[in-house]
Amino acid sequence: MNKALIFDLDGVLVHTDRYHFLAWKQIAGEIGAAFDEKVNDRLRGVSRRESLEIILEGCEEKTTEEQKERLLEKKNSIYRKLLEQLTPESVEVSVRETLERLRANRTRMAIGSSSKNTDYILQRTDLLKYFDAVVDGNNITKSKPDPEVFLKAAQFMGANPADCVVIEDAEAGIRAAKAAGMYAVGIGEAAGYSETDLGIKDMREIQHLVSFN
C-alpha cells in the first residue's frame, strides 16, 4: 500500500526556529529568566504553554496564571510579527520540489504540528495547497510527545497509522510518531535520535519511501 506522509512544520518544511528564539528571548528578558540556545533546544516540538513553563524554571519569582496568559499572548504577538518576513521563497527548493512531485503522484500528505500559527505560515509560504489535512495546536488537546496530533492526521487522511511516515526534526515529535505506531523519519538533529527509523539530510530522500504511479 502507498504510504501516507505526515510532516511537522517548524524546522522541517519552514525554518522558523530563529523567530521562536527571538520571541522567547525577549519574553525571558522581561521576566529575568535565563535563556540561551540550550534552553531553546528544550522548547522544540512542544506547545507554547509548555515552552513558557520551561522558561519559567529559570525565574525566581512565582508567576500567576493571569501573568502567564499575558506572556503567552505577548510571545505570540512578537512571533507573528516576525512571521511577516516569510514568503514562498522562504521554502527551500528541495522541499518544494519534493512536495510538487508527491502531490503529482497523489500521495496523501498532512501537516502534524503543535503550532497554533500553522495556517498562517502555510498561507504565507504558499504550502497549504499540497496537503490533504492540517492538524495543529488549535485542534489537539495534548502536544507531542503524545501521539494525538499524528493519529488525528492519519484519521483525517483516512490512513492506517501503520501506513504513515512522519517527518520530524524534534525528539518530542519522533517519540510521538513511534507512540502512534508510525515510521519515524528524522531530519537535522533528529536524524541521530535512537528512536528514529531513518535519518535524512535532504527532504528529497523521503521519495524512495513512496510508491510512484
Question: Predicted regions span which residues?
Answer:
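Short, acidic loop-to-helix structural element flanking the phosphoryl-transfer center
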Residues: K81-I111
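Asp-based, Mg2+/Mn2+-dependent phosphohydrolase catalytic module
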Residues: M1-K3, R96, E100-R103, S115-N213
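Short, surface-exposed acidic
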Residues: G32-R42, E60-L71, P161
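An amphipathic alpha-helix signature
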Residues: F21, K25, R48-E53, L72, ...
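Metal-dependent phosphoesterase signature
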Residues: L56-V93
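Helix-loop "lid/cap" segments that line or gate small-molecule binding pockets
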Residues: I27, R49-T63, I121, A154
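Active-site neighborhood of HAD-like aspartate-dependent phosphohydrolases
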Residues: M1-D41
